[in-house]
């Protein structure tokens, strides 16, 4: 397949899955009786209730399924979807990151729209750095905590992080802004604005809420979300390269991928266009060792090369690439951090609860600690 076809296929896939995620997110916020009302309008026998909630995207994350298996010794519903993603990664590399992940698509968009880095600054920003090892330490810490019985993967899993940020912070914040706007339009002396405010509020309220919504920690979640997005202006796809534990897991699996980048150094003119367009800082330039664990399968390098010095082909790996560059102390630090999570989480006094001796229990009832 030609390079431009691969790039367009990736763009179409990214757009589809991002819109699907947003659609299912909005559907999960709609009152269920609204579907009943719409069903009655169209047909008494037609059910417009959606049966594919947004949890489908959570099931696509093998990180969620594996952590649940490790921490609770149970296989969650939809585990096979995550297993399929792992198998696909072994075959084709991190195509989930490049083609499917809605959070990755948002980072890609933020990095792409009016990029603040150009020329030599972009080349420098797209060089592999030691900071890309951090995501492996995060992965180790999360799995170590899961082994100890504390599953904290939901905090940093990209699908969970995106859903939490949008549902608890972004959408409620937009709702507050819209209600202020609608109130201003409704109080206007211009009749057209009055009618428009009523119609817009009827359409928007089911999605953004009929009243102001407040969630504990929403400000922190929203600010953290914006900071992570802003970091893309400094280093493209900062989250994907540096922090994403799912990316680390898929990166480990992609080391044996049979879809590999082939380089023809004789054709290379050192224009560095491949480096400028690389989303994963995977060293695509001929003469450098390709970091397939960091490659996000965006195929930008393949498309950008004017000399056809790069191509993706199916071939058996000559051997396992060296394991990620992680020192023993750093790995040990990740393990210690993960093992410490369950104990640090109980420093608020939950570990030493004492039943109130003044409580009176009915005859035959069990102590509170047994509940």
Residue ranges and their predicted role:
Residues 1-288, 293-294, 300-371:
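Non-ligating segments of multi-cofactor redox enzymes
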């Amino acid at each position: 397949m030609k390079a431009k076809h691969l790039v367009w296929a990736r763009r179409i896939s990214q757009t589809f899955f991002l819109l699907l995620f947003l659609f299912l997110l909005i559907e999960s916020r709609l009152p269920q009786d609204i579907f009943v009302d719409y069903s009655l309008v169209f047909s008494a026998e037609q059910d417009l209730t959606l049966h594919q909630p947004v949890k489908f995207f959570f099931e696509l994350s093998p990180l969620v399924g594996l952590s649940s298996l490790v921490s609770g010794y149970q296989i969650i519903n939809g585990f096979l979807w995550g297993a399929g993603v792992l198998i696909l990664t072994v075959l084709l590399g991190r195509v989930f990151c490049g083609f499917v992940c809605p959070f990755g698509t948002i980072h890609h968009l933020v990095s792409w729209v009016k990029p603040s880095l150009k020329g030599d600054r972009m080349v420098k920003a797209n060089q592999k750095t030691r900071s890309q090892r951090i995501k492996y330490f995060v992965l180790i810490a999360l799995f170590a905590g899961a082994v100890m019985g504390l599953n904290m993967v939901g905090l940093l899993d990209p699908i969970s992080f995106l859903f939490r940020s949008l549902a608890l912070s972004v959408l409620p914040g937009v709702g507050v802004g819209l209600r202020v706007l609608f109130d201003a339009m409704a109080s206007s002396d211009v009749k057209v604005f009055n009618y428009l405010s009523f119609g817009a509020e009827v359409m928007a309220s089911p999605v953004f809420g009929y009243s102001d919504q407040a969630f504990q920690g929403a400000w922190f979640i929203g600010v953290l979300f914006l900071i992570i997005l802003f970091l893309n202006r400094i280093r493209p796809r900062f989250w994907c390269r540096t922090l994403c534990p799912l990316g680390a897991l898929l990166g480990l699996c992609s080391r044996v991928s049979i879809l590999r980048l082939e380089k023809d150094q004789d054709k290379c003119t050192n224009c560095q266009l491949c480096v400028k367009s690389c989303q994963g800082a995977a060293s695509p330039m001929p003469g450098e060792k390709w970091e397939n664990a960091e490659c996000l399968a965006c195929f930008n390098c393949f498309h950008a090369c004017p000399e056809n010095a790069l191509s993706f082909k199916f071939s058996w790996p000559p051997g396992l690439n060296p394991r990620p560059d992680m020192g023993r102390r750093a790995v040990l630090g990740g393990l210690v951090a993960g093992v410490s999570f369950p104990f640090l989480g109980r420093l608020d006094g939950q570990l030493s609860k004492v039943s109130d001796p003044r409580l009176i229990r009915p005859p035959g009832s069990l102590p509170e600690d047994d509940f």
